C-alpha cells in the first residue's frame, strides 16, 4: 500500500470507525453468531522484547530460516518456550525446513543464558509437513517433553501417513523416546490442561489410528520404567471413512473422555464418546444422539467446561418436505454420566455456517421455523409453535437489495455477494454474543 503517513493514518481511522459501527450494530442481536470479528483482525500484534531477542537469535544462529507453524488451528505458534530439563531455565524449541537435505524438517533447541538465547543443538524431524507441536510433561517427571506430529503432505485418500515423535531433553542431549504412526492423538484437554483418563493424576498419551477397512484403534499409554506402556485399548469400526474432529476433556461432571467425530458415509457421521472405566477404554452407547446426517464438530459450545456433541433436529411442520429443503436446527447434548444425555443448546446455522443463531435454552421444543413462508438460505421466520408469534426473522439480501432497502433488519454477515440480516422480538434477550470460526467476542 502506497501513500503518505497522514493518508495511511486517515485510512486506518476510517476502517476502525467502520468496524466499531458493525460491533454497535451487533449489540442489538440476540445470541446471534456471525463470522466476523473486525476489531481483533485489525489489532497490530506487538512483540515482547524477549520474543524479539529470541527471533533475532534464531535468524543469527540458524540463518534466515522461517520457523514452521504447525497445521494446528488450536495453537499454530511456531516457537515454544518452557523448562525442558527442570534446571529453572527456559529452553525454546522450533522446527524449520531443510529442503535440500535428506531430512526435510529439522528442529532446534535454544537455551536462555543470562538473557541471551544460545542454540544448544539441532535434531531430526520427519516427513515434509509439521502437523502438530506441543510441550507437555508426558514422562511425568516434572519436565516438559517435545511432542511433534509430522506427515508426508500427501492429501490423497489413505495417502497421508502421519508420524508422532516424543523427544526428551536431559543432560544436555535430546533423545527420541517414542515414535508411532497416528491419525490423531491426545496429550491434553481442550483447555491445554492435563489429560488423565484413568484418574491416577498422571498424564496420558492416546493414539487414534485409522487404516480404512483394516483397523480403527484407540490406545492409551503412560510412561513408566523408561518406556510408554499401553494402559487401555479399544477397536472402533474400521469401515469409517475418516476422522474429522477430535476433542478431549470433561465429558460429564468429574469424568474425562475423548470425543472422536468420525465420517462413516458421504453425508453421515457419528461422535464416538470414549471414557475409561476400571482400566478399560469403552465407547458410550449413545448412538441415538451421536449418529447424524451432518458434519458437526463436538466441543464445549456453552462454555460450562464440559464437552457436547451435536445432532440435527427437524423443526416441527417440516416432516413431509424433501430433506434438502429443511432448515434444520443443530441441538447439542452432554453425557449425563450414566446412560443418558442432557440437552444443552440449540442453534440454527445456514448452509455455509456463516451465521449461528442460538435459541434460548428455555425455548427448546417451543420454537419452530414457519414452513408456510420460510425457505432455507433465503428467508426464515422463527415462531412459537403454540401461538404462531414471530420471535425472529433471518433474511438473505443481495448487496443491491440491502443498499436499496434493508427492511429494518440488522446486519449479521456480509460478503461481496450478499448480506444476512436479522430481526428479533423481546423473547430473545440481547446477550450480544458474536461467535464464529475465528473465535468468540463478547460485546457489552
Outline where the language-model segments fall.
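Charge-rich, low-complexity amphipathic helices
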Residues: 5, 380-386
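Beta-propeller-forming repeat regions
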Residues: 27, 31-382, 399-426, 433-444
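A short acidic-to-branched-hydrophobic micro-motif
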Residues: 384-400
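N-terminal secretory signal peptides that target proteins for export/translocation
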Residues: 1-11
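Sec-dependent N-terminal signal peptides of Gram-positive bacterial secreted proteins and lipoproteins
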Residues: 11-37
